[in-house]
């Protein structure tokens, strides 16, 4: 078994903290370690030395080297979403066809790391070797939903055929659903076994290579170019950005080639200010919510709100009362802000997070 961590992305829903030059995986949002460092530490006990890899594009190669020097780095010429990143890893990491590749995002938060490792081990050592009459399936790990969220895609399992595999609930997967409407999310969360799609996978190297060859041109484009940086850059110029879900997993589920393992580990992708506030609050946002405000946008700011904005080249957090003083509560943003509604009780936590980020960015 070897683990491939995918690190990149603009993290635009967390601006102005997460920016293209230093996106979410490389920030210490919920402690002194960055999300990438926490991910590496979380999975390191499962693999031998030399079996932990990170795929990122050339903008972030040095950040990975600095933050995770023991991880073996695979650098993409440019960002082309997860399908290309996984295809590149499958091509360049030379392992036996039946060795299991685990794929994880670099920027997720997991509270119960022991249970996470246990489930991941079952996915790699049991599920990926065959289940529900599927030989060498593609395994995806689904998160037990806690709210009818419209921020995530959903996984629909065949609960009639599900069972526990080494203690982990597992099912053949019927299909994927894109981020739903409010009404559809409320329907989905009441369906047995339905899970959030978290982008975590386990599969034999040969299984994902065969699936990529069946559903995409990526192995042909990338496989012929891995020996030269120039050739690989040219191949990437011809690749359209597409997720592994769209490129492979949805079709594989239609062909009944996917198994879902169920995770209940206190998970968050920290993909929005609302999710980050919940993380800063120890798992509860206390009714607070947040969103990115664009330059020139007019917003209503209340006394229980916070605003994160750049002032004199640094990010500061200010109370709604201070920001909107003398305006009657209505103000136009003079840059990219974060408006954190009802977050006054989390002011100290937001201050501390901004201080950690500033120290990280100022390191030599």
Task: Locate predicted features.
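Conserved N-terminal catalytic core of the sugar/cofactor nucleotidyltransferase
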Residues: 1-5, 13-16, 20-121, 127-130, ...
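Solvent-exposed alpha-helices and their adjacent loops that cap or buttress functional pockets
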Residues: 6, 45-47, 93-96, 102-103, ...
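Alpha-helical scaffold segments in soluble metabolic enzymes
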Residues: 25, 38, 42, 63, ...
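Generic preference for hydrophobic
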Residues: 26, 73, 176, 259-260, ...
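Residue-level signal for inorganic ion chemistry
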Residues: 36, 89, 107, 155, ...
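A short acidic, often aromatic-flanked loop/helix-cap motif at beta-alpha or helix-coil junctions
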Residues: 79-84, 147-149, 182-184, 267-268
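Conserved core of the sugar-phosphate nucleotidyltransferase
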Residues: 112-224, 229-234, 256-257, 325, ...
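Left-handed beta-helix
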Residues: 203-364
């Amino acid at each position: 078994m070897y683990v491939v961590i995918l690190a990149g992305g603009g993290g635009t829903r967390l601006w102005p903290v997460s920016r293209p030059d230093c996106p979410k995986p490389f920030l210490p949002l919920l402690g002194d370690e960055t999300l990438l460092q926490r991910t590496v530490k979380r999975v390191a006990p499962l693999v031998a030395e030399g079996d932990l890899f990170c795929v990122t594009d050339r903008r972030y190669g040095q950040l990975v080297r600095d933050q995770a020097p023991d991880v073996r780095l695979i650098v993409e010429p440019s960002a082309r979403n997860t399908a290309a990143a996984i295809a590149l890893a499958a091509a360049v990491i030379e392992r036996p066809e039946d060795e299991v590749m685990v794929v994880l995002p670099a920027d997720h938060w997991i509270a119960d790391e022991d249970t996470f490792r246990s489930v991941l081990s079952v996915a790699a050592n049991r599920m990926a070797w065959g289940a529900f009459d599927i030989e060498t399936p593609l395994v995806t790990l689904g998160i037990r939903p806690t709210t009818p969220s419209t921020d995530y895609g959903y996984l629909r399992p065949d609960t009639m055929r599900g069972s526990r595999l080494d203690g982990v609930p597992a099912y053949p997967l019927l299909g994927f659903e894109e981020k739903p409407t409010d009404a559809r999310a409320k329907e989905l969360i009441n369906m047995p076994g339905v899970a959030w799609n978290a982008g975590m996978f386990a599969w034999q190297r040969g299984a994902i290579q065969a699936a990529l060859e069946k559903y995409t041109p990526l192995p042909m484009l990338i496989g012929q170019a891995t020996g030269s940086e120039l050739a690989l850059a040219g191949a990437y110029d011809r690749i359209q950005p597409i997720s592994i879900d769209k490129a492979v997993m949805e079709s594989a589920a239609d062909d009944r080639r996917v198994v879902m393992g169920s995770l209940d580990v206190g998970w968050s992708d920290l993909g929005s200010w609302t999710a980050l506030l919940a993380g800063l609050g120890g798992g509860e946002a206390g009714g607070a919510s947040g969103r990115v405000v664009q330059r020139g946008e007019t917003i209503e700011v209340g006394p229980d709100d916070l605003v994160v904005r750049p002032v004199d080249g640094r990010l500061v957090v200010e109370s709604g009362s201070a920001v909107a003083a003398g305006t009657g509560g209505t103000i136009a943003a003079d840059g990219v802000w974060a408006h954190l509604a009802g977050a006054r009780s989390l002011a100290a936590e937001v201050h501390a997070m901004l201080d950690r980020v500033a120290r990280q960015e100022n390191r030599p």
